[in-house]
Amino acid sequence: MSLFDKKHLVTQADALPGRNTPMPIATLHAVNEHSMTNVPAGMEIAYFAMGCFWGVERLFWQLPGVYSTAAGYAGGYTPNPTYREVCSGQTGHAEAVRIVYDPAVIRYEQLLQTFWENHDPTQGMQQGNDHGTQYRSAIYPLTPEQNAAAHASRERFQAAMAAAGDHRPITTEIAHATPFYYAEDEHQQYLHKNPYGYCGIGGIGVCLPPDA
């Protein structure tokens, strides 16, 4: 598949078949030693895609109220894809991060603020120097409330961009969450294990106005 093709989403009919077996990952988060899979009572889940998941995961695990994070794949068709398959552009997935958070400490709207202010949501099928459908900007809401908040935040951020003189249209995908597949264990908490590793995310200098 050529680089040109990787800028266009594969159809479900043409996606790779994948496999039934999930990727094996460590039981505990390498940074805070919380469970990588369990969701404690009262906590909620959010899914975001904003480029290379190494830097995105680190961005969110540093936030107060975030219980755990995981790198993975969302928004595609191929079950339990490998990193190589996702990078081929033939699975339909975006590199995404699963965030388990305590809404009593950090609100979903605060996670959205981190999302919008720390990448460029106008670049379509790339983020910075990373090209391909897996690097697209996306929010995958799990509830009607998350969906409404995501759409409202996109409108506010687009208006804030215009006020700052940036009239590029936002290309961020907002779609109901499809299955999230954990990435291989080597990608989990990658920048903790490899402190000098690559991190290609960065904002555009615009702040998300607060919700009403």
Swiss-Prot record:
GO CC field: cytoplasm
Gene3D superfamilies: Peptide methionine sulphoxide reductase MsrA
InterPro entries (alphabetical): Met_Sox_Rdtase_MsrA_dom, Met_Sox_Rdtase_MsrA_sf, MsrA_MetSO_reductase
Domain of life: Bacteria
EC number per UniProt: 1.8.4.11
Matching Pfam families: PMSR
Annotated keywords: Oxidoreductase
Homology family: Belongs to the MsrA Met sulfoxide reductase family.
Protein purpose: Has an important function as a repair enzyme for proteins that have been inactivated by oxidation. Catalyzes the reversible oxidation-reduction of methionine sulfoxide in proteins to methionine.
Name of this protein: Peptide methionine sulfoxide reductase MsrA
Organism: Salmonella agona (strain SL483)
